Design a protein with these regions (language model features):
Chain B
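Acidic beta-strand-to-loop metal/phosphate-binding motif
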Residues: 19, 75-79
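Non-catalytic, surface beta->alpha helical segment in thiol-disulfide oxidoreductase systems
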Residues: 78-108
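Secondary-structure boundary/capping motif
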Residues: 27-28, 56, 85
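Thiol/disulfide oxidoreductase modules built on the thioredoxin-like
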Residues: 64-72
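Local sequence-structure signature of Cys/Sec-based thiol-disulfide redox active-site neighborhoods
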Residues: 8-46
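Thiol-based oxidoreductase modules, predominantly thioredoxin-like and allied folds used
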Residues: 43-60
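Flexible, polar/low-complexity N-terminal or interdomain linker segments that lie immediately upstream
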Residues: 1-8
């Protein structure tokens, strides 16, 4: 599932850097960095990542996914 | 009134409105609890609706997901706009943006 998620995000946002950590086998941390997030509200950034995942897995399966999105600049300055 | 109209009214009537599992005094989920904690720290007034309270509104839990096209609860609304769920609320709180959205640009 971890590779699938990575691939789906990559397909949706081709220039994204995707970092996924599964800490305990249940909870997933995903960090997505992309210039496509420039000037986009956080909620829209999350939608850009979550919408393709939602259609693949359904909403319930993704309850345990903690998502962080960054523009390259925000990532550098975090 | 349909559930979508009931949600719209709650969002219109409350400048800050949170749809959550449980109540602010007794949250039933860690994510809902964290959003309430943030609002308490900002010391702002907010309205809340418990999506698990079927006696109050059995359609709310699914209705709110359709309203925002967002799959999870809690959900925070400010000035009628959907802000986000737990992760986004915490991030906006930490960057100071949430306070600006609620209190205005003059907030210090």
């Amino acid at each position: 599932m971890q590779e699938n998620i990575e691939q789906l995000i990559q397909n949706a946002i081709p220039d994204a850097t995707v970092i996924i950590n599964m800490n305990d086998g249940v909870h997933l941390d995903a960090i997505v960095i992309s210039p496509a997030f420039e000037g986009v509200t956080l909620v829209k950034q999350h939608r850009m990542v979550m919408t393709p995942l939602k259609s693949a897995f359904g909403s319930e399966a993704l309850h345990a996914l903690a998502l962080k999105t960054y523009t390259p600049e925000k990532w550098k300055n975090r | 009134m349909s559930v979508q109209e009931r949600i719209q009214k709650l969002v219109d009537d409350n400048k800050v409105m949170v749809f959550m599992k449980g109540t602010p005094a007794q949250p039933m989920c860690g994510f809902s609890s964290r959003v309430v904690e943030v609002l308490k720290r900002l010391a702002v007034e907010f309205g809340s609706a418990n999506v698990l309270d079927d006696a109050a509104d059995p359609e709310l839990r699914d209705g709110i997901k359709g309203f925002s096209d967002w799959p999870t609860i809690p959900q925070l609304y400010v000035d009628g706009e959907f802000v986000g769920g737990c992760d986004i609320v915490i991030e906006l709180y930490q960057s100071g943006e949430l306070e600006k959205m609620i209190v205005g640009e003059n907030a210090e």
